[in-house]
Amino acid sequence: MSAFTPASEVLLRHSDDFEQSRILFAGDLQDDLPARLDTAASRAHTQQFHHWQVLSCQMGDNARFSLVATANDVADCDTLIYYWPKNKPEAQFQLMNLLSLLPVGTDIFVVGENRSGVRSAEQMLADYAPLNKVDSARRCGLYFGRLEKQPVFDADKFWGEYSVDGLTVKTLPGVFSRDGLDVGSQLLLSTLTPHTKGKVLDVGCGAGVLSVAFARHSPKIRLTLCDVSAPAVEASRATLAANGVEGEVFASNVFSEVKGCFDMIISNPPFHDGMQTSLDAAQTLIRGAVRHLNSGGELRIVANAFLPYPDVLDETFGFHEVIAQTGRFKVYRAIMTRQAKKG
C-alpha cells in the first residue's frame, strides 16, 4: 500500500478542499492515503484486516477494523470519504451503517472506478444524501453530497442463508460465494477423505462451508478458520454454530495471526483484492505453509487452472501433485517433508 490507486489520485486533485476537514475514510481502502492526506483530523474504518494492519501502523487507534462501525469510530468527523467496492450489497451494508452514525450535515464523498459500478451510489443514497458527480478522471468517478437524513441500520437484516447437501451456510455482503457454493470449492470438497483426523486450518474461510462440510464426514478433526474479511469471520462463526460444529475463527492476513502447526491446511485462495488482481495472498499461503504444517502434513488448495501456482509449490515443497481438475480448476496437493523444511 504505497502507490496510490486511481481513486485516490482523483481525490488528490481536490486535496485543498480537505485541509480543514475531519475525515472518516471507509470502504475499499487499497492504499494509505487516509494516513497521508493533509486534513484537520483523519479516521479510518475497514472490514479488511490487511488494510487495517497497514493503516494502524500509521494512524494508531484512529484506524479501526470491525464488521460494524460504532459511534466511537466516527466521533467528531464532519466528512466521509467512501471508496466504493466492487460488491454493491457490501457498499449498501457499509454506507447504511456509517450514515446512521454520522450527523446530518456531514459532507459525503464517494469515489470509485467506473467498472466497479460506483455510479449506482447516486440511486443508493438518493433518500439520504443526494449525490452529484464532481469529477471524472483515471476511469473513476467522484461524487459529492450532504447528509440530509440518517438511515435506520439493522445489521441482522443483511444476513443471508443457503443450504448445501443438508448443511446451513450463513452469509453476509462481501463474503465470497455469498449466493451459493462456488465450483472451485465443490471440486476441493470432492477430494477430502472421510474419517480424517488431526488439526485442520481453513485459510480464507469465507462463509465456512469448506470446514463444516469437512467436519460432517470427519467429525474428529479440530478446526481453525481465518480470513482477512470481518464479514467472513462472522459468517463462518454463524455457519459453524448453525451446524453444531466447533472451531476457532479469527481475522488474519493469511498466517499473520496463526499460531502453531497443523496436519492439513485447506484453502480456496483469492486472486483479487477489491478490483485489483493480486496473487500475493496465495503465494504467501504456499510459502508460509511450511512453517505451519506438521511433518507429513499437507497443503491442499483449489485454484483457477491458469494461475501460476505450480512453480511456487515446487519451489516451496520440492514437488506437488494435481489430484482433481476440470477445464477451469485444479486441486493441488503438497506434502510437508524434510525436503520442504530445508527449502
Swiss-Prot record:
It is found in: Cytoplasm. Its EC number is 2.1.1.172. The lineage of its organism: Bacteria, Pseudomonadati, Pseudomonadota, Gammaproteobacteria, Enterobacterales. It is an enzyme of class 2 (transferase). This is Ribosomal RNA small subunit methyltransferase C. InterPro entries: DNA_methylase_N6_adenine_CS (IPR002052), Mtase_sm_N (IPR013675), rRNA_ssu_MeTfrase_C (IPR023543), RsmC/RlmG (IPR046977), SAM-dependent_MTases_sf (IPR029063), Small_mtfrase_dom (IPR007848). It catalyses: guanosine(1207) in 16S rRNA + S-adenosyl-L-methionine = N(2)-methylguanosine(1207) in 16S rRNA + S-adenosyl-L-homocysteine + H(+). The keyword Methyltransferase applies.
